Amino acid sequence: EIPGNTGNIARLCAANHMTLHLIKPLGFSIDDKHVKRAGLDYWHLVDVQVHENIQELYAKYPDRRYFYATTKAKHTHSEVKYEIGDMLVFGPESRGLPESLLEGVEETCIRIPMVDEARSLNLSNAVAIIAYEAMRQLDYPDLKAEGNWIQPK
């Protein structure tokens, strides 16, 4: 729904060698200037796949584990033991994932702990929190092991 969030998520995916799967309807064009601006110059680093619906995604990746981010979940995102290839599923910012999608998958629904008074987090922030927890558990595969310290003159 919000082009800037999608751009931020694309940048996160680019920086971590993650594929970004988008499910139609998107509500904006992937070429939207706000999407492009938020993703900066990282677009060549991210594999973006657009699917007509969630069933198309399931059909293309039938052997993957899917985790559904929802404020309604009983399990937190850090209780899961993530594996390479796991799929993290998020809904639109304004309404989250539909109840019909969550029926029957309650054990794979995850949430980020927060105070009762808050409805939800910004979508791109939630994606980053959960994605980095998964990466942390997997010991940050394929990512840079050390930073580049500024050398004194």
Features from the language model and the residues they span:
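Post-transcriptional modification and biogenesis factors for structured RNAs
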Residues: 1-153
